[in-house]
């Protein structure tokens, strides 16, 4: 039975919209392609995946064929398949897949072939109208071998080629099943095909009838092109090819790239030629390696002093306190007319945004709303031209955050972005960007990107306060000076608390629940600490405002429940001292019910040790900067607990680094 249009509509909306970015690596050049692609995919393992595959052309012994190998599970399984059945060539594409349509099996792994077996496709994203397309293709006689939406793309390209063949019926040598050439260039067939797709996609395409050619197209999920010395690359993210070249073109939405051994040709979906915009990436390739650490996450925790320093560098004056944001396109005078700020973000970035609310309201004296980007456009928000939108995203490609940005723009708001990737989609639509110079973050659980986001938010809060004229030069200089001291203080924290967190992990790694408490700006850090623990150790953890204990969480407390309480203070800030005193009362509520308390406290606070079971001290800092320091022991505690529990720290189950569709 053929499904009705209504069924198509319903089913197409039931697609799993949380597909993360899969890994794509393509190569064309003089080298053997298999090692290049496999190594590139390995450098993209942080994205999360459950199957892998590769297609290769250019084998001198079989020049008119594409050889394909696939395997479920990790890359080592694919390598084992290749070891048993070797393939050779000088161009090809590889893919690591996160299952959304269909099970994580070899049949559903990419690359996927068309009906002729001569064309292959890899794909990151979701084809929303794949059911309707599939039904139409089946009616034409197409047969499908997988449960995926990606296979549809290969057949759509085949369909475009066959339509041209039909139009040219009678012309010799145009049958794609037997001909050594295509009726139209491969890139033209791809351009025609992508116009029929609804959804998000970044694709790579090879055809046995278009040797030494790799075609890529993008609409939504990220894709980058690499320009080397007589060799060219395609990848879904920079680390996949950074060890070969630093010369990168970020493929834009609506672009099609044709890679050959002589260069890259770029067009839009209509075939109009476009120039390459090659950027030199400053990341050192070694930044994307473990550098001797057991896990990427531990390496990235220890890189936080540099991440904070680099995010601050060049943006503040240590002599005047002035803040400079060179990528700001909003005129300074315009900041006077904004009546409010709306922050939209997801996950860890949302926690950073919630902390940013306290920074911006305290320094710039302007109301701030913080929204989950995934909820924002569905609640009928009412921003206008007096609302400043601030989007926070590590990758710059998070689908929900991009959608929130478009909603803000649609309703007349100007938007700014805090992002870790130069040239990402979020930055291109924004009127200003603060790049978090954290470098590539490989571990799925964010660490250094979070502290860099907190730093960027603090810098922006100062910038906004200065443009609004609500902060004195002396106050600005004080805050800038204190910010400049944070990297050294982070180094102190890393040196002093790692062993202590490791010892605490021995005590608490078998617990089934954790509670994290904080007040004011420390509450978002409690949320982040709980998220880190649940992400990588699979322990249920909850963050809660300490002042809300009487409204429910007290019922959970007994001798089996560890309670992590952020009890830091800035003695020079009366409001900070008041929150600290209130927090001590909350700690006593916990201990009165036999709860076990781990306190994060400020150096010099020895009295708190009389109230709690364990104390982790961090250096003193102004109230608004303490979150950058106090999150580090929470990261390390989560890390050591996860390691003791035998969890995959860098690639937690059911999670991936970036989510590029809803």
Task: Indicate where each model-derived feature is located.
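Conserved short alpha-helical segments that host acidic/polar catalytic motifs at enzyme active sites
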Residues: 14-295, 299, 303-337, 473, ...
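Glycine-rich oxoanion-binding loops at beta->alpha junctions
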Residues: 94-107, 319-332, 356-392, 398, ...
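Active-site phosphate/pyrophosphate-binding segments
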Residues: 304-342, 422, 432-567, 643-662
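Glycine-rich phosphate-binding loops that contact phosphosugars or nucleotide phosphates
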Residues: 333-485, 568-577, 581-614, 637
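Generic C-terminus detector
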Residues: 271, 297, 596, 621-662
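Acidic/histidine-rich
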Residues: 197-231, 509-537, 567-569, 577-584
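N-terminal amphipathic/basic-hydrophobic helices that include classical n-h-c signal peptides
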Residues: 1-20
């Amino acid at each position: 039975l053929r499904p009705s249009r209504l069924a198509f509509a319903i089913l197409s909306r039931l697609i799993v919209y949380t597909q993360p970015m899969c890994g794509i690596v393509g190569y064309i050049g003089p080298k053997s392609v298999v090692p290049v692609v496999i190594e590139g995919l390995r450098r993209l393992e942080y994205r999360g995946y459950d199957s892998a595959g590769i297609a290769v052309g250019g084998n001198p012994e079989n020049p008119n064929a594409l050889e394909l190998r696939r395997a479920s599970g990790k890359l080592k399984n694919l390598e084992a398949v290749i070891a048993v059945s070797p393939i050779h060539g000088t161009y090809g594409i590889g893919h690591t897949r996160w299952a959304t349509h269909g099970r994580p099996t070899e049949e559903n792994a990419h690359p996927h072939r068309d009906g002729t077996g001569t064309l292959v496709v890899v794909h990151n994203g979701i084809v929303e109208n794949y059911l309707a397309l599939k039904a139409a293709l089946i009616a034409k006689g197409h047969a499908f071998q997988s449960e995926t939406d990606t296979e549809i793309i290969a057949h759509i390209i085949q369909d475009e080629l066959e339509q041209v063949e039909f139009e040219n019926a009678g012309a010799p040598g145009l049958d794609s099943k037997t001909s050594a050439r295509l009726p139209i260039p491969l890139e033209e067939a791809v351009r025609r095909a992508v116009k029929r797709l609804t959804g998000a996609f970044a694709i790579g395409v090879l055809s046995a009838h278009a040797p030494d050619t790799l075609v890529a197209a993008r609409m939504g999920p990220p894709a980058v092109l690499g320009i080397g010395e007589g060799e060219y690359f395609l990848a879904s993210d920079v680390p996949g090819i950074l060890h070969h070249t630093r010369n990168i073109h970020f493929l834009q939405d609506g672009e099609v790239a044709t890679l050959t051994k002589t260069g890259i040709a770029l067009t839009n979906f209509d075939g109009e030629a476009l120039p390459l915009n090659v950027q030199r990436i400053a990341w050192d390739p070694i930044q994307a390696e473990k550098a001797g650490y057991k896990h990427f996450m531990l390496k990235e925790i220890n890189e936080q002093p540099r991440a904070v320093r680099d995010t601050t560098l060049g943006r503040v004056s240590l002599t005047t306190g002035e803040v400079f944001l060179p990528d700001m396109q909003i005129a300074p005078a315009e900041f006077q007319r904004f009546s409010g700020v709306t922050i939209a973000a997801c996950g860890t970035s949302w926690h950073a945004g919630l902390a940013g609310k306290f920074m911006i309201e305290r320094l710039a004296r302007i109301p701030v709303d913080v929204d989950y980007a995934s909820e924002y456009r569905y609640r009928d928000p009412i921003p206008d031209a007096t609302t400043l939108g601030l989007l926070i995203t590590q990758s710059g490609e998070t689908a929900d955050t991009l959608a929130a940005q478009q909603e803000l723009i649609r309703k007349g708001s100007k938007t700014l972005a805090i992002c870790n990737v130069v040239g990402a989609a979020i930055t291109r639509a924004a009127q200003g960007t603060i790049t978090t110079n954290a470098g590539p973050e490989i571990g799925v659980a964010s660490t250094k990107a979070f502290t860099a986001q907190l730093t960027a938010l603090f810098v922006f809060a100062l910038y906004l306060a200065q443009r609004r004229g609500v902060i004195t030069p002396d106050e600005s200089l004080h805050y800038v000076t204190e910010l400049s001291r944070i990297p050294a203080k982070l180094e102190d924290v890393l040196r002093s608390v790692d062993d202590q967190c490791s010892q605490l992990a021995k005590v608490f790694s078998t617990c089934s629940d954790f509670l994290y408490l904080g007040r004011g700006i420390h509450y978002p850090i409690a949320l982040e600490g709980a998220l880190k623990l649940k992400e990588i150790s699979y322990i249920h953890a909850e963050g809660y405002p300490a002042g809300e204990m009487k409204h429910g969480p007290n019922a959970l407390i007994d001798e089996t429940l560890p309670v992590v309480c952020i009890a830091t203070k800035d003695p020079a800030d009366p409001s900070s001292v008041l929150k600290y005193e209130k927090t001590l009362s909350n700690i006593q509520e916990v201990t009165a019910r036999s709860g076990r308390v781990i306190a994060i406290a400020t150096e010099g606070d020895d009295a708190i040790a009389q109230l709690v079971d364990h104390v982790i001290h961090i250096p003193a800092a102004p109230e608004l900067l303490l979150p950058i320091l106090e999150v580090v022991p929470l990261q390390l505690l989560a890390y050591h607990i996860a390691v003791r529990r035998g969890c995959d720290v860098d690639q937690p189950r059911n999670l991936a680094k970036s989510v590029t569709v809803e």
